[in-house]
Curated annotation (Swiss-Prot):
Belongs to the RecO family. Keywords: DNA damage, DNA recombination, DNA repair. It comes from the Bacteria. SUPFAM superfamilies: ArfGap/RecO-like zinc finger, Nucleic acid-binding proteins. This is DNA repair protein RecO. GO terms for biological process: DNA recombination; double-strand break repair. The gene is recO. One of its GO terms (cellular component) is bacterial nucleoid.
Length: 256
């Protein structure tokens, strides 16, 4: 298990999900800064006087002291940095928080470490908490960062067929994850609007912090969502479910 860490170590981590285990314990899935996604046991976490009650709630972010056992990690100590429990009082923020956690659970292998992705993940939670950015733009930006970090990066600047710089296109290759120039055959992909292509290109190369500067219509947001939903569905073994009902309700609002 792991790669070169001591049997007991401290790492920043956020809880992705929990599951009751035996009479008094919990299984906790964490996205950690040092070793990526892991599952750990929190012994006694279900007891009313447990020191782990608050620190084993979904979305809790803190410094976790983990012990590496033969087949499972265990949580020894926790210092909470931010519980992010305020996200639970708003349907939008709880849905997107759950979605970000679900993406990590689906996209990352056990102990697949990526510190840059971890930073973007935690930043996304602070943007959710402060509602300092359009949540759909935040989600699309994080999706693009995740796809890139897990080996499914795009090239919106150069043609994915011939490698020449793209001046203008609205065609995406499903196989090669990128734009196709006007000189190359357009097969095995699909057309999108020029506006949606521009949004994808901007969000892909910008930082999470700067994504808020772009203004996007609801129509283009919906188009970009469908594009990335398709790529996420084909890239990973499971399709995330957290946004499906939520987006159905949102689309109903737009159409009223």
């Amino acid at each position: 298990m792991g790669d070169g860490f001591l049997s007991i170590f401290k790492t920043k981590a956020l809880i992705l999900k929990t599951q009751d285990y035996k009479e008094n314990d919990k299984l906790v899935w964490l996205f950690t800064e040092k070793i990526g996604k892991v599952c750990a046991i929190a012994k006694g976490a279900k007891k009313s006087k447990s020191k782990f009650i608050a620190s084993t709630q979904t979305f809790c972010f803190g410094e976790y002291v983990l012990y590496r056992g033969k087949s499972l990690y265990s949580i020894n100590e926790v210092e909470i940095i931010d519980s992010f429990q305020s996200l639970l009082s708003d349907m939008d923020t709880i849905t997107y928080g759950s979605y970000f956690c679900e993406l990590i659970l689906i996209a990352l292998e056990q102990e697949q470490s990526d510190r840059e992705l971890f930073k973007d993940f935690i930043k996304s939670f602070y943007f959710l908490k402060n509602q300092a950015m359009d949540l759909e733009i935040l989600a699309r930006t994080f999706e693009l960062k995740l796809l890139k970090a897990t080996g499914y990066g795009f090239d919106f600047e150069k043609c994915c067929i011939c490698g020449k710089r793209i001046n203008k296109t609205n065609y995406l290759s499903i196989q090669y994850y990128g734009g196709v120039c006007d000189n190359c055959e357009k097969t095995g992909g699909f057309k999108i609007s020029y506006a949606a292509y521009g949004v994808l290109k901007f969000l892909y190369k910008t930082s999470i912090e700067n994504a808020h500067i772009i203004s996007v219509s609801n129509e283009i947001k919906e188009e970009v969502y469908k594009v990335l939903d398709m790529f996420i569905s084909q890239s990973y073994s499971k399709k995330p479910k957290s946004l499906e009902i939520f987006n159905y309700l949102k689309r109903s609002e737009y159409n009223e």
